[in-house]
A protein has these predicted regions:
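P-loop NTP-binding core
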Residues: 1-244
Length: 244
């Protein structure tokens, strides 16, 4: 089993869309039993799969009251793909983790799910606190979406530095350009400066994920966006294989 965290300290970089689509590629293309776990109280991952948050707001209970995560898992309409949705109870997750004082709570829970899933994709909130520290401890690979700009390399270095600060024995980190538009000179310059970074294009198909509440591979499998997610997923599987 491998845990893949999609994490950024900055919002609005396509993090949730990337996490939701990677989970689908894991289940549909790699044929792996996959869990998409939404840790962001905004609940975007659930929305992208048409799953509404529970009115009972229990997502935080798996951390605070030792509720089995399996009790809150929803099946999606896609084979091998399940979702553990977020809700407003996660808004105080940082304080909750600080109060219970269990530094590896998330790691232990993902390990407990290893019998059911081969891949767990975490959609993480854009924060630098105990949540991000627990994510780094639990993850086998951290995906960092970045906007294409001349400062992308510096931005990635800062995120990587923070990850190392929280966990010296940190997992591999894979940067990915999100919302890249090759028609823009600055975007081309950023990509040319980092040609080995995977990229997700700025495309209407990506925007349609929220409208259709479906992964792009379902309704636009031949699109540039679907190819971008496929290439990113291939890079992820390669990184995991290299890490052993």
């Amino acid at each position: 089993m491998a845990v893949i965290a999609v994490y950024s300290v900055k919002g609005g970089v396509g993090k949730t869309t990337i996490a939701a689509n990677l989970a689908w590629f894991s289940a549909a293309i790699s044929k792996r039993r996959t869990l998409l776990w939404d840790l962001d109280a905004a609940g975007g991952a659930g929305f992208l799969y048409g799953i509404e948050p529970s009115k009972r707001a229990r997502a935080g209970s798996v951390f605070s009251r030792d509720v089995d995560p399996a009790e809150l898992i929803h099946k999606t309409e896609y084979d091998r793909l399940d979702l553990l949705p977020a809700d407003e109870s996660l808004r105080d997750l940082d304080g909750m983790l600080a109060r219970i004082g269990k530094k590896r709570r998330l790691e232990r829970m993902t390990q407990a799910l290893a019998k059911r899933y081969e891949r767990i994709v975490l959609d993480c909130p854009p924060v630098l606190n105990e949540i991000s520290a627990q994510v780094v401890r639990a993850a086998d690979l951290v995906i960092v979406p970045l906007p294409p700009s001349p400062l992308s390399t510096r931005a990635f270095a800062l995120v990587a530095e923070e990850i190392r600060r929280h966990s010296p024995a940190h997992p591999p980190i894979l940067p990915v350009f999100s919302m890249i538009d090759r028609r823009r000179a600055l975007h081309r310059e950023a990509q040319d400066a980092n040609p080995n970074w995977p990229m997700i294009p700025l495309a209407s198909a990506v925007e349609q994920c929220a409208v259709r509440q479906q992964p792009v591979g379902v309704f636009a499998p031949a699109s540039a966006a679907a190819k971008g997610f496929q290439q990113l997923w291939t890079a992820i599987e390669r990184k995991l294989a290299e890490a052993g």
